[in-house]
């Protein structure tokens, strides 16, 4: 039996609000009430891993183009086959302050979805073992979790998506947005990467990927945990749970802005690490 995970740091000022089917409407109402004052949205997902890789037959002679097209084809194949398990959202203002939702604590959200069934659905074994070790109860998700279609309906009306005043903050986020786009559109991901980015620009007009931003920062390297450590950001909650990861993403982004960037970051928006937006690369956006 694996040992129960230990949060890296307890913080009595933070409440990770667990969202299940019974309280979905209530929690989405709180998010809708908060979004205007806290327009930075950090997002992370947990999903059943990567179960296949594709072989590209694209004759494109540009090896750089082949690289991101292959990455998208692999992402698309996996997202279309698999089901989202958990999604974390952290809302903040530009200084990193979080909503309190009428309590004496700062609130972040962790949505637990019901669709994935470990008995009948495909998954990567190492990913599921890691999620179990991170205290994600897949059976409880199955029984009590959020209905993904209802979540998508509520998110569409919340002001969080389709809103160019919202700044999405993520880390190496192609799969995160792939799963969210599949939920919001109710369809499989589009065949072509250019159509994927058309959907991205519609639903999430402003997106910052920390992994992409690292390329403009000195002496930053590694994954999210390492970057957070280098910037002096400590985790609250359990690693590999989406709520905790979304908060770590938000706080790391705030520190990066403070240390490495001045003024607007909009020129860095829309680039996802490993899935370079062909419209931005050719200067054809808008």
UniProtKB/Swiss-Prot annotation:
Its main location: nucleus. The keyword Transmembrane helix does not apply. A divalent metal cation binds at residues 44, 46, 176, 245. It is an enzyme of class 3 (hydrolase). Its cofactor is a divalent metal cation. Signal peptide: none annotated. The keyword Transport does not apply. It comes from the Eukaryota. The modification N-acetylserine is found at residue 2. Pfam families: CAF1. SUPFAM superfamilies: Ribonuclease H-like. Keywords: Acetylation, Cytoplasm, Exonuclease, Hydrolase, Metal-binding, Nuclease, Nucleus, RNA-binding, Transcription, Transcription regulation. One of its GO terms (molecular function) is poly(A)-specific ribonuclease activity. GO terms for cellular component: CCR4-NOT complex; cytoplasm; nucleus. It is found in: Nucleus; Cytoplasm. It catalyses: Exonucleolytic cleavage of poly(A) to 5'-AMP. Its EC number is 3.1.13.4. Component of the CCR4-NOT complex, at least composed of CRR4 and CAF1 proteins. Ubiquitous transcription factor required for a diverse set of processes. It is a component of the CCR4 complex involved in the control of gene expression. Belongs to the CAF1 family. This is Probable CCR4-associated factor 1 homolog 2. The gene is CAF1-2.
């Amino acid at each position: 039996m694996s040992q129960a995970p230990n949060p890296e740091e307890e913080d009595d000022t933070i409440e990770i609000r667990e969202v299940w089917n019974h309280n979905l409407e209530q929690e989405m109402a709180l998010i809708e009430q908060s979004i205007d004052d806290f327009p930075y949205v950090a997002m992370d997902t947990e999903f059943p891993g990567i179960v296949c890789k594709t072989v590209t037959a694209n004759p494109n002679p540009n090896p750089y183009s082949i690289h991101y097209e292959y990455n998208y084809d692999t992402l698309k194949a996996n997202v279309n086959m698999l089901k989202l398990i958990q999604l974390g959202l952290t809302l903040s203002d530009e200084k990193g302050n979080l909503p309190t939702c009428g309590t004496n604590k700062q609130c972040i959200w962790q949505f637990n979805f019901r669709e994935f069934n470990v008995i009948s659905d495909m998954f990567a074994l190492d990913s599921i073992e890691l999620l179990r070790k991170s205290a994600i109860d897949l059976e409880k998700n199955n029984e009590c979790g959020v209905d993904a279609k209802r979540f998508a309906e509520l998110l569409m009306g919340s002001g969080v998506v389709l809103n160019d005043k919202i700044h999405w903050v993520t880390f190496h986020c192609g799969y995160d947005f792939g799963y969210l786009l599949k939920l919001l559109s109710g369809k499989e991901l589009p065949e072509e990467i250019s159509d994927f980015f058309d959907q991205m620009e519609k639903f999430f007009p402003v997106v910052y990927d920390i992994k992409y931003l690292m390329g403009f920062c000195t002496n930053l390297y590694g994954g999210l945990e390492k970057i957070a450590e280098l910037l002096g950001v400590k985790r609250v909650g359990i690693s590999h749970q989406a709520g905790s990861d979304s908060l770590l993403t938000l706080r790391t982004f705030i520190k990066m802005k403070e240390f490495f960037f001045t003024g607007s970051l909009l020129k860095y928006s829309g680039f996802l690490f490993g899935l370079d937006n062909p419209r931005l690369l050719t200067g054809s956006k808008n």
